[in-house]
Amino acid sequence: MRVADFDFELPPDLIAQFPPDVRGASRLLHVTAAGALHDRMFRELPTLLGADDLLVMNDTRVIKARLFGEKDSGGRVELLVERVTGEFEALAFIRASHAPKPGARIRLADDVALDVLDKQHDLTRLHFPAPVLDVLDRCGRLPLPPYIEHAPTEEDEARYQTVYANEPGAVAAPTAGLHFDAAMLGTLQTQGVRTARVTLHVGAGTFQPVRVAEVADHVMHSERYTVPAATVAAIAETRARGGRVVAVGTTSLRALEAASASGSVEAGVGETAIFITPGYRFRTVDALVTNFHLPRSTLLMLVSAFSGIETIRRAYAHAIAERYRFFSYGDAMFLEKASLETPA
């Protein structure tokens, strides 16, 4: 397969720059297992779920990972913390006219100074003078995606975060979860739909373009995930009842499928660079709540694996014609796993 097979033209004005006025006031494109398309509103999601179904949500919390500082020479430095590796250490991407070398210092606001320890491939290991998360809360900015063109605001700090975010560590939001508010979660609970949690700390690699021509040549970035024992038990109970496992977002799906490498989902903590493309056989997830993804992206390949390439092409063409809003602050899809998972 060629990466060009996953390209499409998107009018720039369909890229959502701001969230809807009310969380959850989004549209929902329902794609059935047979490939039928239905235009709905996100508030209708409970009508698509049964009492025996299980929603699995990613409870990662976005950190203020973007930092601005100066080198001792006075040169400006922009940092994006990719991963917190210890209480006082982190790995970061650094943008500067001349990259600071090991032993150099980067000065942030309020006389906070970071020590450059060493390089690890494209990342730089940094030592912080105080706990990393404290420094980020004090000096950092929310790392909005590159296609959102405004500087982060207080509204973004609230809305670019799920209402159930709990585990700090992501540099991008698990955006399918942004549609859920407390009222929706209450409705689902009343209906008997259960929820469970996984954690996958979304890395900056989620925004990196695929730079190769052939899909098979792409190398995925690695991300940390946790699947609790309680979630594994909930999945087993759901299977016993005949219900569906519904992943909220591609990050939840990737965590569950990574933890299912043996054939069934297992509890644990790990790293995954799972790359899901058409032809992949899904082991755990039966349905998926997701946003609309970027052209030529690995996430578009993932949903094409889930629903079929031609079905996703039709769905995206329909969404563009009907002026759905795209990407992080955009509208959602509810995908039922294709009856036959084939490359077509």
Swiss-Prot record:
Coiled coil: none annotated. One of its GO terms (cellular component) is cytoplasm. It catalyses: 7-aminomethyl-7-carbaguanosine(34) in tRNA + S-adenosyl-L-methionine = epoxyqueuosine(34) in tRNA + adenine + L-methionine + 2 H(+). Keywords: Cytoplasm, Queuosine biosynthesis, S-adenosyl-L-methionine, Transferase. It holds the Pfam family Queuosine_synth. GO terms for biological process: queuosine biosynthetic process; tRNA wobble guanine modification. Its EC number is 2.4.99.17. Monomer. Belongs to the QueA family. Transfers and isomerizes the ribose moiety from AdoMet to the 7-aminomethyl group of 7-deazaguanine (preQ1-tRNA) to give epoxyqueuosine (oQ-tRNA). This is S-adenosylmethionine:tRNA ribosyltransferase-isomerase. It comes from Thiobacillus denitrificans (strain ATCC 25259 / T1). The gene is queA.
